[in-house]
Every structure is written in structure tokens, then in C-alpha cells.
Amino acid sequence: MSSKPFTPEEARRIVQVLQKPAVFLNMTTDWPALHWTVEHLSACLTKRIRFRVGKRSEDMAPLFETECSYVEATIKEFLSWTANDGEPLVGPFLDYHCKEFWAYADYKYIAQLFQDKPAMFQDVVWSDFGFPGRDGRDSTLWIGTQCANTPCHLDSYGCNLVFQIQGRKRWHLFPPDDTACLYPTRVPYEESSVFSHVNVIRPDLKKFPAYGRARLYTVTLQPGQVLFVPRHWWHYVESVDPVTVSVNSWIEMDMDDEARVAEALTKTIVCAVKSSPSLDNSDQWLNPTEDGVSSHDENMQYLNLAVKVCMNKKRDDIEDQPKAEAVKRDFSGVLKSPASPPSLVSFGPHLIPVHLTEKPQCSSTKDSCCFSCTDSPQCQITTKDQDKLRSDNKLGQRSGQSVLQDTENPGGSGEMHISTNDVLECLVHPDVIALVTRLIMCRQRELHS
């Protein structure tokens, strides 16, 4: 086994302590998964998988997964499509020219893809990061073309380790404290994902003026590198090179117990509101990654179960602590002694911090398939504009539109219209859900103490 810059214990401590994104170097030099290029995978996996297809666009609105097309194809067929250079299109990608569209096989669980080749699970060695037993079975595979992207979002559970295998990916990250600047939305609804209304590559600052205050961290992840994404950091990811392959694993945390209560509450509200028939409630609100709409009874059962598990876990944690000491946790949610000294992380050639970018810059370099227009005159917004936007209270999402705006009422006179989605945006806003979750937990503790 080759020498690593960090022992598993050191790597795990770094992951537990770090509160900002960072890149590990030279930790995967002996991982067999380094050879998981798209050519290698095409020989290992012959069954068809689903690719999300989107048009290369300069729109200011984000392209959500509900607005994409989907193609069932083998990786070999995908490879042939990416290699097409003006030849007549054939196969599953017949309707999509590779110069006009991108394709992304995302969120593919390796345990399902290679269930008949379990030996491949060992190719991904997360135990090197201090998580023994974690391998490909606990990971997802991502295969995409240039410009393939994931809409800006945050993950409700855990932290994230991302191993880049082939090609480069550009990551745009924002800290949890900047959530208000990213205009969070739960439509389209996906369990454990909070999306942003903002296209962070081409932001519309007239609709989303607060985004101008968001703190942007950027990094281009190279093959062999591993990116650490802390809990609840927003991220938008796009493929830079013609073909990219990466593998990630979400690392569970004790704090996920309460997050599951919040997610169960969110799902209950979203399903209840969006399942109600109304004239403005016919949009595609459920993400294609979801199996279907569960009933209100099912959602309430899951909410009760999540609350019960969380309460039992908190009760066990408190009982395990000496009575004279307060219960404290480190960043990963693990209980620690109040006397424990703070741990510091030393950056160097094998651990590089992801740096803050002062402001989004216009870019037309080869490293980016899109560009940000925040410096152009039409994207500038004055203080007067900001005051008007605030007074207009333009927030939320109308059916088929990204923000509330003046519209014609049935009688023909122009007036402001509040839609079902506008109300829902407020009800399931992360701040509101966090408050209601705390109220539920406090009330249940009172009833069962």
C-alpha cells in the first residue's frame, strides 16, 4: 500500500473539524476506482441507465430536473454519442445533438448498478478517510458531458466526500449562513434537497437582489482529488471537460436525526398543499427522482417515527453524560467533553482550502461552459431598484414562474396575485421549518418527560 499524507484517523478528524470546503490531494493514488473512466465503465456495465438531458442555454432561470428530458441508454451508447462529430445521429440520443445538449447520469447508486459485480465495491476505499467498511456500496456514480450540471441546492443530511475520476468539475459553493441570499425553494420537491431559485452562473439580480451579497467559494476539482463539502453548504456543480466521472459518499451525522424530522415535516406540508386541486396548482412539482406522492397518513406516520427516533437518541445521549456536564457536540454531531481543546487543521500541499471568490466574474474561458453576467450593465441593480423590490415583496414562486409578479386578474385589472406556490414557499422555508421542528420537539418532550 502506498504512503498517504494522512492516516485514516487524521483524515477523519479533519472531516469532523473542518467547517469550510477543502480538497484532499494524494489520498487516492492506489484506489482501483481511479481506472473507472467512462471507457472502462462501458465494458463493466452493459445495461441501460437513465441520463438527464438538458439544452446548453444562456437563460437566467435555473434548469430544474422537472424541465429536463430523459434518455435510457448504455454507457457505450453514451460514448458513441459524445464522439459524434457531424455524423447522422442514431440510437437513444437521436433527438439530441451533443453540441447543443448535455447529458448526465447522476445519483446512480453503485450498489444497484454493480449488484452482479460486488468485487467492484472494494475499488472505492473510503476507509482511507477513517470510515471503515465504507466503500462503493455507500456511494453514488456521476457520468456527464461538458455543461452537465446539478441545480444549486443544499443537502439536508450529512457532509459529502467527492472523488473526481475523469475530467474536471467546477464547484460553486456558498455557506449555510447565506441561505437567505439564495432564495430557497422546495418546488420541485425532492426529499433531502433544498433548491435555489437563482441561476448562480447567470444570476438575475433584478429578481434576486440579495444574491449579490452571497459569498461564493469556487474550485475546479481535478482527477484523483477528493472534495470535502461540509454540512448544509449550498453547491452548484458543472462538468468542465467533454466527459466527466466522479463518485461521492454522504457521511451521516448525529444531527441528521433532527434533520429527518424537518424533512418529514416538509414532505407532509408539500404533499398536502400540492395534492389539493386548484387552478394554479397543476405544475410539475415532484422531482423525477421521487417514486411518487405518498398519502397524508403515510407522511404523518413517517413524521411520528422520525420524532420518536430523534427523541430516543437525544434521551440516550443525555443519560450517557455525567449530570454535572452540559451536552456538547463537535461539528460532526459527535458528543465531546466540555473540556476538550479546539482542534486546528493545518493546510498544506495535501490539503487545500477552497477559497472565497470576491464576486462572480464574467468568464468566457475554456474552464467554464457558461458565463456570469453580473458585471454587465443590464445586470446591475441600484439602491432605488432594491428598495422597490423590497416594497413589492417579490418572493416565492408562481406556477410556471420563478418569482411573484404583477399579473392580470380574471377581471382584467392589473393587481398582485399570490399563488399556491407563494404560500407554500413561506410555509416550507428552511427558517420556518427549523422553528416548527423545534416547537414539535419541545412539545413532545413536555408531554413525555
Swiss-Prot record:
Q: What keyword terms does UniProt attach to this protein?
A: Cytoplasm
Per UniProt, the ranges with Basic and acidic residues bias are: 385-395
For molecular function, the Gene Ontology terms on record are: 2-oxoglutarate-dependent dioxygenase activity
Q: Where in the cell is it found?
A: Cytoplasm
Record keyword Cytoplasm present? yes
Would you say which domain of life the source belongs to? Eukaryota
What are its GO cellular component terms?
A: cytoplasm
Domain JmjC: from-to ranges: 102-266
Task: Provide the function of this protein.
Answer: May play a role in cellular stress response.
Q: Output the PANTHER family linked to this UniProt entry.
A: HSPB1-ASSOCIATED PROTEIN 1, HYPOXIA-INDUCIBLE FACTOR 1 ALPHA INHIBITOR-RELATED
Query: What is the protein named?
Result: HSPB1-associated protein 1 homolog
Q: Which organism is it from?
A: Danio rerio (Zebrafish)
